[in-house]
Amino acid sequence: MEWTGQVYADSPVVAAKILIDAPPERVWDLVSEIALMAELSSELQEVTWLDGVTGPAVGHRFTGRNAHPAMGEWETVSTVTECDPPHRFAWAVGDPAHPSASWRFTLKPDGEGTLLEQWYQMGPARSGLNIAIDAMPDKEAKIVFVRMREHETGMRHNLAEIKDRAERAG
């Protein structure tokens, strides 16, 4: 990831892609299984569907429990904002109309395989990262850059794991 100098109010975006030798339907089964994200992530520790639902659909909510060495532990509530099998799965953290973060998987057929993209947007609503920014406003661009780089690294790991699982399942 290259330095951008972006600040939180810019709502910066980061994405990663991978080509998977498996059909979109098989990849969809993995990316839409929210418990798998907790298994793959070093930060997301546990995910639980709320309101008695057991799977993804627009409007369904889930809790995410997170831990980070520099930021401690916290819990978020996310809402599924897009659920279009086997093409797009997205959720907003916090208020879906004004989220603290947005995440999305996009699946595109590529021959007999799938091009999978994971995408993240910071903000526009405040998040736990704002505690560090408020404490060191002169370092905001660096704080944002480091956090975005962490997300990019995590995405690359997630995509590699999803690729491995999807290809082994075939």
Predicted ranges, named:
Residues 95-153, 162-164:
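Beta-strand/loop substructures that line and gate deep hydrophobic ligand-binding cavities in soluble
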Residues 48-102, 110-112, 153-170:
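Glycine-rich portal/gate segments that line the openings of hydrophobic small-molecule binding cavities
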Residues 23-26, 150, 154:
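Short amphipathic alpha-helical segments
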Residues 13, 19, 79, 90, ...:
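Conserved beta-strand segments that form the floor/walls of ligand-binding pockets within enzyme
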Residues 20, 66, 120-122:
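Hydrophobic beta-strand positions in extracellular immunoglobulin-like domains
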